[in-house]
Amino acid sequence: MDREEAAKELMAMLEEAQEGPYYSEEEVRAHLLEILAPRNQVYMTGDTHGQFERVIEFCARREVEPENTFVILGDAGLNYYNDRRDRKKKDQLAQVPITFFCLHGNHEMRPSEELGYEVAEYHGGKVWMQPAYPNILFAIDGEVYDFNGNSCIVIGGAYSVDKYYRLARGWSLFPDEQPSEEIKAKVERVLAERNWKIDIVLSHTGPLKYEPTEVFLPMIDQSTVDKSTEVWLEQIEAKLDYERWYFAHYHTEKEVGKIRIMHNDYTMIPHEASVAAEKDMLRRMHRQAEIMEALGLLDDAPNQKNGDDIS
């Protein structure tokens, strides 16, 4: 659903609403998010592990533009082999007219000068970039980026729960997969300088108390899993004043309060102006619903419909 389609559908919904059908707040919000979004849209998804077909299809469907940003919340799968196989994946993404903004995961090497990366600037923060692939960027942990008026701090890395499985098969394992003490100190220093207030946290794993234990693999002995990063993030979360926190890593999709765990789903980082407009529209919608309810027009409301693939 693009902006024009969203506008047409919302107009049709408003016309139908004059005759009684009631649309949910979530359904209206999905359309407003598309209509009110700025041109420099920021999309986001979870781990891709080198499988970019769904991302490329999504970008084609959305008719993305070079000034748009696509955030991958770690384990993009672009720095795994450090050979032609990685270059093939990068060549694939280089054809997509959008800037990919990747967090560091646990199943990949950290970008460095040794891998041919250079430090560049993007949306107010430092990133790693290879000159041959200027639209593929890797965030630097502890940096704060401005996406549509939102201050966003990045915290990559996690522990590989499949560590021993990978070692037994001779698969790659990266010793610096988790944030170092130096990185942790930087993150805490940056947040302290901001009086522990940030709009959005983008991380690969998340605070310990939000672990989706219901999807844990039964063959993994959790007592062998190093959860020091999650414990540290929980300590960060306890004293942080934030609006939203997005992370991936667990290959599941879940929302708990201000926390959202992402996998194959998509969302957008909204513009602060669009958020204000959305809230105003929703306030008016609530008022209209109250009036309709008082008149007894909501008693026979139809079943609610499904929204778009962005939420």
Show where each model-derived region lies.
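Core catalytic region of metal-dependent phosphoesterases/phosphodiesterases
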Residues: R3-E9, G20-R29, I35, Q41, ...
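Active-site-proximal loop/helix segment associated with metal-binding centers of metalloenzymes
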Residues: E15-Y22, P134, N148-K227
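Beta-strand-turn-beta hairpins that frame and shape the catalytic cleft
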Residues: L33-Y43, V144-V154, I200, V256-R260
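Structural motif
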Residues: M44, F70-L73, I200-H204, Y246
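Catalytic metal-binding/acid-base residues of hydrolase active sites
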Residues: H49, A76-G77, N106-M109, A158-S160, ...
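Conserved beta-sheet core of the metallophosphoesterase superfamily
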Residues: D91, T99-L103, E118-H123, M129, ...
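Long, low-complexity, intrinsically disordered segments
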Residues: L295-S311
